[in-house]
Amino acid sequence: MSSSTYRKLPKILAAGLAIGCAGGYYAYKNSNKPPGLNPEIYAPFTVNKITELTSDASLFSLVPQSPSEHLTTLEPIAKVTIRDPSMQVQRPYTPLYLDANELKFFIRKYEEGPVSSYIHSKKEGDTIELRGPFKTTKLDCTKYPRIVAIVAGTGIAPIYQLAQSVKSPVDIVYCSRPGQPPLLKEELEKECPNVRVKSVQNRLVNIHDILDWDNVTVPLKDTLCIVCGSQKFVSTIAGPKADYGARQGEVKGLLSNNPFGKVWKL
């Protein structure tokens, strides 16, 4: 080793040590960052805004505490699971939008529902843990030239998400509680010009509500019909899902004489 190289050695070692320390600090710093939304482990989100719609239903706007790239390329209809860590219970929820910077949920509180009660106990600034996203169905909704959706209550959420991602006409039969307006109807129609909403209130939905629409050019045999709501509602409209697996079950109920090309129960 030459004398000049020997004299430079402390500087070289110091530079290497500095680089190593910087790399170690970066790794340590990033190891302490909370995870972004992912399907494997729960990630923390901050409750950014709560908008009360009724005494038992609100919009919850959640923002990730770390970047969540998984939502940028996902196709509808997608869902996440939310858990109450104190009880180790979880439940799937469908966000209204697929936005990497914010997830907005339409959630109704049920006294017998531990997760919905947990979410409604939160205040702006609190943390809620999410995991996902997951595909709700393998059905390719984008290939149908027209979609008819029959929904009740918070069952509007998957259709809200879907309507923003397809160019096809989406005609929605929206059944709401007696004396209660169809929540988010005006927002959905404003945001999605391809959407028409027919509100059914204070009575039972009938087959004419589903089939009778003006200015329809797509044959029913080419139309996708989606039914979304409580188990009882889905069963009344299209028959129950199969008791095992993720099978759809036979189409019965109000749609027993099924005129649609495809009926899908969510």
From Swiss-Prot:
GO molecular function: oxidoreductase activity
Entry-linked PANTHER family: NADH-CYTOCHROME B5 REDUCTASE, NADH-CYTOCHROME B5 REDUCTASE-LIKE
GO cellular component, one term: mitochondrion
Locations listed in the record: Mitochondrion outer membrane
Keyword Oxidoreductase among record annotations: yes
Keywords: FAD, Flavoprotein, Membrane, Mitochondrion, Mitochondrion outer membrane, NAD, Oxidoreductase, Transmembrane, Transmembrane helix
InterPro entries, A to Z: CBR-like, Cbr1-like_FAD-bd_dom, FAD-bd_FR_type, FNR_nucleotide-bd, Riboflavin_synthase-like_b-brl
Cofactor: FAD
Bilayer disposition of the protein: Single-pass membrane protein
One Pfam family it belongs to: FAD_binding_6
Entry's transmembrane regions: 12-28
Name of the protein in question: Uncharacterized FAD-binding protein C17H9.12c
Similarity comment: family membership: Belongs to the flavoprotein pyridine nucleotide cytochrome reductase family.
GO terms classed as biological process: mitochondrion organization
Lineage: Eukaryota, Fungi, Dikarya, Ascomycota, Taphrinomycotina
Ranges of residues in domain FAD-binding FR-type: 40-140
Superkingdom of source: Eukaryota
